[in-house]
Amino acid sequence: MRKIIIAGNWKMYKTQAEALEFVQVFKSKIEDTDESREIVLCAPFTDLGAMSKNLHGSRIKLGAQNVHWEEAGAYTGEISGAMLTEIGVSYVIVGHSERRQYFGDTDETVNLRVLAAQKYGLIPILCVGESKSQRDAGETEKIIINQLKRDLVDVDQNKLVIAYEPIWAIGTGDTCESSEANRVIGIIREQLTNKNVSIQYGGSVKPGNIDEIMKQSEIDGALVGGASLNPADFAQIVNYK
């Protein structure tokens, strides 16, 4: 049985005070949300400790946005899996296109991060997707299959979430047609040994398109960027019909 997982990726937004204010408002808007839907908030590192205390006993799971592959060491500015699990983090985004584009993540380092996350009991949300030029060149399928091949070496697919995020649709307002997202996610599923991995769509998800996205047979949730910053908008997404 594939689990529905809706995750908000706050990126580099929200101070601790803003995060706690969000949680207070958001909690009140999801009291009647279908219990089978997993709700995750992936917040900046500085928010996680305070949010963990605030979310204790609630149905909302806490997620981080990155994790280093080493347990400890002279890696200035990095955070390990052990540090995240200690403060109650359950999920971690790995391989987001912004990490690949701006911070030099490769399929090899993404694979190390996924393995480290699993080692410390975190569920990685592995992001894969093609750029505009790759899509225009008809390379979508090839690019994604290659990413998966490299990113999933030795990975336990029973403790994994995948997010298909077409890079050209992130933060641009351009949403991939839901039928096309469904087709690509079907291709992703074909590459997996565990066909029950939850696969999300990410890329300009908002209250106005979530119903259509979630009607698709292959799509098991969403990785939501900008629209997750507003508690009313994110609640609408979580409460899709």
Curated annotation (Swiss-Prot):
Main location: cytoplasm
Entry binding sites for substrate: 9-11, 171, 204, 225-226
InterPro entries linked: Aldolase_TIM, TIM_sf, TrioseP_Isoase_bac/euk, Triosephosphate_isomerase, Triosephosphate_isomerase_AS
Associated pathway: Carbohydrate biosynthesis; gluconeogenesis; Carbohydrate degradation; glycolysis; D-glyceraldehyde 3-phosphate from glycerone phosphate: step 1/1
Residue positions of the active site: 96, 165
Compartments it resides in: Cytoplasm
Gene3D superfamilies in UniProt: Aldolase class I (3.20.20.70)
Enzyme Commission designation: 5.3.1.1
GO cellular component assignments: cytosol
NCBIfam families to which the protein is assigned, alphabetical: tim (TIGR00419)
Quaternary context: Homodimer.
Family under the similarity heading: Belongs to the triosephosphate isomerase family.
PANTHER family, per database record: TRIOSEPHOSPHATE ISOMERASE
Protein known as: Triosephosphate isomerase
Organism listed in the record: Gloeothece citriformis (strain PCC 7424)
Source taxonomy: Bacteria, Bacillati, Cyanobacteriota, Cyanophyceae, Oscillatoriophycideae
